[in-house]
Regions:
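Short active-site oxyanion
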Residues: 28-34, 112-116, 168-169
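A contiguous loop/helix-start segment that scaffolds small-molecule binding in enzyme catalytic cores
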Residues: 2-5, 84-85, 164-233
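Alpha-helix capping/helix-boundary segments
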Residues: 40-42, 93-94, 123, 177
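Conserved helicase motor
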Residues: 61-68, 144-148
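Class I SAM-dependent methyltransferase SAM-binding "motif I" and its flanking Rossmann-like core
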Residues: 5, 103-161
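Glycine-rich, flexible N-terminal cofactor/catalytic loop recognition
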Residues: 1-63
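Short glycine-rich anion-binding loops that position phosphate/pyrophosphate groups of nucleotides
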Residues: 11-13, 91-95, 175-176, 203
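Glycine/small-residue-rich loop that forms an oxyanion/phosphate-binding "nest" at active or ligand-binding sites
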Residues: 64, 72-113
Protein backbone atom coordinates (compact mmCIF):
# COMPACT_ATOMS: atom_id res chain seq x y z
CA UNK A 1 0.00 0.00 0.00
CA UNK A 2 1.14 3.59 -0.58
CA UNK A 3 2.32 5.90 2.20
CA UNK A 4 0.85 9.29 3.08
CA UNK A 5 3.44 11.59 4.66
CA UNK A 6 2.30 14.50 6.84
CA UNK A 7 4.97 17.11 6.15
CA UNK A 8 5.39 20.12 8.48
CA UNK A 9 6.52 23.40 6.96
CA UNK A 10 8.23 26.42 8.58
CA UNK A 11 6.18 28.90 10.59
CA UNK A 12 8.45 31.81 9.66
CA UNK A 13 10.24 32.59 6.39
CA UNK A 14 13.86 31.55 6.11
CA UNK A 15 13.84 29.24 9.14
CA UNK A 16 13.69 25.81 7.46
CA UNK A 17 17.31 24.87 8.30
CA UNK A 18 16.70 25.66 11.98
CA UNK A 19 13.29 24.02 12.49
CA UNK A 20 13.07 21.06 10.09
CA UNK A 21 14.95 17.74 10.44
CA UNK A 22 16.78 16.18 7.46
CA UNK A 23 13.99 13.61 7.14
CA UNK A 24 11.73 16.28 5.62
CA UNK A 25 14.12 16.87 2.73
CA UNK A 26 14.56 13.13 2.19
CA UNK A 27 10.81 12.52 2.01
CA UNK A 28 10.18 15.47 -0.31
CA UNK A 29 12.97 14.29 -2.61
CA UNK A 30 11.29 10.88 -2.90
CA UNK A 31 7.65 12.02 -3.12
CA UNK A 32 6.12 13.36 -6.33
CA UNK A 33 2.47 13.92 -5.33
CA UNK A 34 1.08 16.33 -2.74
CA UNK A 35 -2.09 17.67 -1.18
CA UNK A 36 -1.42 21.26 -0.11
CA UNK A 37 -3.25 24.16 1.53
CA UNK A 38 -1.63 26.81 -0.67
CA UNK A 39 -0.21 26.05 -4.11
CA UNK A 40 2.25 28.96 -4.23
CA UNK A 41 3.80 28.42 -0.80
CA UNK A 42 4.01 24.66 -1.35
CA UNK A 43 5.87 25.07 -4.65
CA UNK A 44 8.20 27.60 -3.06
CA UNK A 45 8.88 25.32 -0.09
CA UNK A 46 9.65 22.32 -2.28
CA UNK A 47 11.99 24.45 -4.41
CA UNK A 48 13.77 25.93 -1.37
CA UNK A 49 14.65 22.45 -0.09
CA UNK A 50 16.88 22.04 -3.18
CA UNK A 51 16.16 18.35 -3.62
CA UNK A 52 16.45 18.55 -7.39
CA UNK A 53 12.76 17.82 -7.76
CA UNK A 54 11.24 19.44 -10.86
CA UNK A 55 8.05 21.26 -9.87
CA UNK A 56 6.48 20.82 -13.32
CA UNK A 57 6.85 17.04 -12.93
CA UNK A 58 5.26 17.04 -9.47
CA UNK A 59 1.54 16.43 -8.92
CA UNK A 60 0.15 19.05 -6.53
CA UNK A 61 -3.52 19.00 -5.52
CA UNK A 62 -5.12 21.91 -3.67
CA UNK A 63 -6.60 20.93 -0.31
CA UNK A 64 -8.08 23.91 1.51
CA UNK A 65 -11.29 24.55 3.43
CA UNK A 66 -13.24 24.98 0.18
CA UNK A 67 -12.00 21.87 -1.64
CA UNK A 68 -14.87 19.43 -2.36
CA UNK A 69 -14.26 16.11 -0.62
CA UNK A 70 -15.32 14.30 -3.79
CA UNK A 71 -12.34 15.85 -5.62
CA UNK A 72 -9.90 14.78 -2.91
CA UNK A 73 -11.37 11.28 -2.80
CA UNK A 74 -10.93 10.86 -6.55
CA UNK A 75 -7.36 12.16 -6.40
CA UNK A 76 -6.23 9.85 -3.61
CA UNK A 77 -7.90 6.85 -5.27
CA UNK A 78 -6.02 7.60 -8.50
CA UNK A 79 -2.74 7.76 -6.58
CA UNK A 80 -3.56 4.45 -4.90
CA UNK A 81 -4.25 2.76 -8.23
CA UNK A 82 -0.82 3.90 -9.43
CA UNK A 83 0.80 2.91 -6.10
CA UNK A 84 2.20 6.42 -5.64
CA UNK A 85 3.11 7.83 -2.24
CA UNK A 86 1.87 11.32 -1.37
CA UNK A 87 2.58 14.15 1.04
CA UNK A 88 0.31 16.62 2.83
CA UNK A 89 1.43 20.20 3.54
CA UNK A 90 -0.30 23.09 5.25
CA UNK A 91 0.62 26.69 4.54
CA UNK A 92 2.64 26.80 7.76
CA UNK A 93 3.22 24.29 10.55
CA UNK A 94 1.71 20.83 10.91
CA UNK A 95 -0.97 19.64 8.46
CA UNK A 96 -4.20 18.46 10.03
CA UNK A 97 -3.71 20.52 13.20
CA UNK A 98 -5.54 23.85 12.94
CA UNK A 99 -5.01 23.42 9.19
CA UNK A 100 -6.44 21.32 6.34
CA UNK A 101 -5.27 17.74 6.06
CA UNK A 102 -7.55 15.66 8.28
CA UNK A 103 -9.91 14.88 5.38
CA UNK A 104 -7.28 13.25 3.18
CA UNK A 105 -5.72 11.48 6.19
CA UNK A 106 -9.11 9.99 7.06
CA UNK A 107 -9.52 8.80 3.47
CA UNK A 108 -6.04 7.28 3.50
CA UNK A 109 -6.86 5.28 6.63
CA UNK A 110 -10.06 3.94 5.04
CA UNK A 111 -8.14 2.88 1.94
CA UNK A 112 -5.48 1.12 4.00
CA UNK A 113 -2.62 3.52 3.34
CA UNK A 114 0.29 3.77 5.73
CA UNK A 115 0.14 7.21 7.41
CA UNK A 116 3.42 8.72 8.62
CA UNK A 117 3.49 12.04 10.55
CA UNK A 118 6.88 13.76 10.34
CA UNK A 119 8.47 15.92 13.02
CA UNK A 120 8.24 19.69 12.67
CA UNK A 121 7.06 22.96 14.21
CA UNK A 122 3.55 23.42 15.62
CA UNK A 123 2.68 26.96 16.73
CA UNK A 124 0.11 25.58 19.18
CA UNK A 125 2.49 23.23 20.99
CA UNK A 126 5.38 25.71 20.92
CA UNK A 127 3.10 28.37 22.41
CA UNK A 128 1.94 26.02 25.15
CA UNK A 129 5.53 25.03 25.93
CA UNK A 130 6.57 28.67 26.22
CA UNK A 131 3.55 29.88 28.20
CA UNK A 132 4.24 28.50 31.66
CA UNK A 133 0.53 27.60 31.83
CA UNK A 134 -0.97 24.15 32.38
CA UNK A 135 0.49 21.72 29.86
CA UNK A 136 -1.32 18.71 31.34
CA UNK A 137 -4.84 19.90 30.55
CA UNK A 138 -5.53 22.23 27.64
CA UNK A 139 -7.96 22.79 24.78
CA UNK A 140 -7.56 24.46 21.40
CA UNK A 141 -10.58 26.45 20.20
CA UNK A 142 -9.25 27.57 16.83
CA UNK A 143 -10.61 30.89 15.59
CA UNK A 144 -13.13 32.79 17.71
CA UNK A 145 -16.39 34.21 16.27
CA UNK A 146 -16.08 37.38 14.22
CA UNK A 147 -19.22 38.96 15.69
CA UNK A 148 -18.14 41.02 18.68
CA UNK A 149 -20.98 39.89 20.95
CA UNK A 150 -20.41 36.23 20.11
CA UNK A 151 -16.68 36.68 20.60
CA UNK A 152 -17.28 38.23 24.02
CA UNK A 153 -19.40 35.25 25.04
CA UNK A 154 -16.71 32.87 23.80
CA UNK A 155 -14.04 34.67 25.83
CA UNK A 156 -16.13 34.61 29.00
CA UNK A 157 -16.85 30.91 28.47
CA UNK A 158 -13.15 30.11 28.04
CA UNK A 159 -12.19 32.10 31.11
CA UNK A 160 -14.80 30.21 33.15
CA UNK A 161 -13.52 26.88 31.83
CA UNK A 162 -9.95 27.88 32.65
CA UNK A 163 -10.89 28.77 36.22
CA UNK A 164 -13.11 25.76 36.91
CA UNK A 165 -10.98 23.11 35.23
CA UNK A 166 -7.53 24.71 35.62
CA UNK A 167 -7.34 24.10 31.88
CA UNK A 168 -5.30 26.24 29.49
CA UNK A 169 -7.49 27.74 26.75
CA UNK A 170 -5.72 28.21 23.41
CA UNK A 171 -7.05 30.19 20.45
CA UNK A 172 -6.02 32.42 17.57
CA UNK A 173 -7.30 35.06 15.18
CA UNK A 174 -6.74 36.14 11.59
CA UNK A 175 -3.56 38.27 11.93
CA UNK A 176 -5.13 41.53 10.76
CA UNK A 177 -7.71 41.28 13.58
CA UNK A 178 -5.21 40.50 16.36
CA UNK A 179 -5.23 43.97 17.91
CA UNK A 180 -9.02 44.03 17.98
CA UNK A 181 -9.08 40.62 19.67
CA UNK A 182 -6.49 41.77 22.20
CA UNK A 183 -8.73 44.70 23.12
CA UNK A 184 -11.73 42.41 23.52
CA UNK A 185 -9.78 40.08 25.80
CA UNK A 186 -8.78 43.01 28.01
CA UNK A 187 -12.39 44.18 28.14
CA UNK A 188 -13.98 40.80 28.83
CA UNK A 189 -11.58 38.94 31.14
CA UNK A 190 -10.88 39.37 34.84
CA UNK A 191 -7.81 41.39 35.91
CA UNK A 192 -6.01 38.43 37.50
CA UNK A 193 -6.57 35.98 34.64
CA UNK A 194 -3.24 35.07 33.08
CA UNK A 195 -2.72 35.36 29.34
CA UNK A 196 0.24 34.35 27.21
CA UNK A 197 0.76 36.03 23.84
CA UNK A 198 3.00 34.14 21.41
CA UNK A 199 3.74 36.08 18.22
CA UNK A 200 5.92 35.17 15.21
CA UNK A 201 7.15 32.03 16.97
CA UNK A 202 10.49 30.67 15.60
CA UNK A 203 11.19 33.97 13.78
CA UNK A 204 14.09 36.22 14.84
CA UNK A 205 11.58 38.78 16.17
CA UNK A 206 9.46 36.24 18.07
CA UNK A 207 7.53 37.69 21.02
CA UNK A 208 6.48 35.50 23.98
CA UNK A 209 5.13 36.91 27.25
CA UNK A 210 2.75 35.74 29.97
CA UNK A 211 1.11 38.40 32.16
CA UNK A 212 -2.13 39.02 33.99
CA UNK A 213 -4.87 40.90 32.15
CA UNK A 214 -4.22 43.82 34.51
CA UNK A 215 -0.57 43.91 33.43
CA UNK A 216 -1.39 43.59 29.73
CA UNK A 217 -3.83 46.48 29.98
CA UNK A 218 -1.05 48.91 30.82
CA UNK A 219 1.08 47.98 27.80
CA UNK A 220 -0.54 46.40 24.75
CA UNK A 221 1.75 44.95 22.06
CA UNK A 222 1.19 45.68 18.38
CA UNK A 223 0.16 42.34 16.87
CA UNK A 224 -1.28 43.65 13.60
CA UNK A 225 -0.76 41.19 10.73
CA UNK A 226 1.56 39.02 12.84
CA UNK A 227 0.71 35.32 13.34
CA UNK A 228 -0.21 35.02 17.02
CA UNK A 229 -1.44 32.37 19.46
CA UNK A 230 -3.29 33.39 22.63
CA UNK A 231 -3.49 31.29 25.80
CA UNK A 232 -5.63 31.91 28.90
CA UNK A 233 -5.58 30.42 32.39
Amino acid sequence: MPTLYLIPTPLADGTAPQVLPPTITEVVAATDAYFVENLRTARRFITELKTGRVIDETTIHLLDKDTPQADTRKQIQELMERKRNAGVMSEAGCPGVAAPGAVVVGMAHKLGWKVVPLVGPSSILLALMASGLNGQSFVFHGYLPIDRNDRGRALRFMEKEAQQRLQTQIFMETPYRNNQLMGDIIAQCQPETRMCVVCNITAPDAFVQTKTIREWKSQLPDLHKKPTVFLLL
